[in-house]
Amino acid sequence: MKQQLLLLEDVDGLGRSGDIVTARPGYVRNYLLPQKKAIIAGAGTLRLQAKLKEERLLRAAEDRAESEKLAELLKDLVLEFQVRVDPDNNMYGSVTISDIIAEAAKKNVILTRKNFPNAHYAIKNLGKKSVPLKLKEGVTATLFVEVSSESAYIAVLNQQSSQEQTVAAEELE
């Protein structure tokens, strides 16, 4: 027989903080109650439920504002990766979620694995890719990732340095 519970925290697949839900006894006994994620619903829990819903609404508004701000920041951000390639321009390895998170952190953008709806996402081709992100409170964003070969990157640096040398030589004359 399922039990009625008042959730104290958001629980994936069950409900949000302040919701009264039903769950199987084993799940309740072994997970929800020991982790203090829920209490058994009774007559006295209605006041607590109202308080939890009010807190959840305030937190949801803050999370939505923060997520929209982050989505606006991500709209203009392009993460660049230089990778090793073979002569046929096939990448050695791939650009993974961990690489994207680390590169974003260097640009003061905090992302976690939870932000990536496709948990096994990896970029295996050169070029500019769009990566879908799921932020808090249903806000979605797109992050752009540009993957180029190290040899192309080195060629651009060499071209820039040769141009600088040409300018320096002209200045000496």
UniProtKB/Swiss-Prot annotation:
Listed InterPro entries: Ribosomal_bL9, Ribosomal_bL9/RNase_H1_N, Ribosomal_bL9_bac/chp, Ribosomal_bL9_C, Ribosomal_bL9_C_sf, Ribosomal_bL9_N, Ribosomal_bL9_N_sf
Listed GO biological process terms: translation
Coiled coil (UniProt feature): none
PROSITE patterns according to UniProt: RIBOSOMAL_L9
A GO CC term attached to the entry: ribosome
Keyword rRNA-binding: yes
UniProt entry keywords in alphabetical sequence: Ribonucleoprotein, Ribosomal protein, RNA-binding, rRNA-binding
Gene3D superfamilies: Ribosomal protein L9, C-terminal domain, Ribosomal protein L9, N-terminal domain
Pfam families recorded: Ribosomal_L9_C, Ribosomal_L9_N
GO molecular function terms attached to this record: rRNA binding; structural constituent of ribosome
HAMAP family reported for this sequence: Ribosomal_bL9
PANTHER family on file: 50S RIBOSOMAL PROTEIN L9
Function: Binds to the 23S rRNA.
Record family assignment: Belongs to the bacterial ribosomal protein bL9 family.
Protein known as: Large ribosomal subunit protein bL9
Organism: Chlamydia felis (strain Fe/C-56)
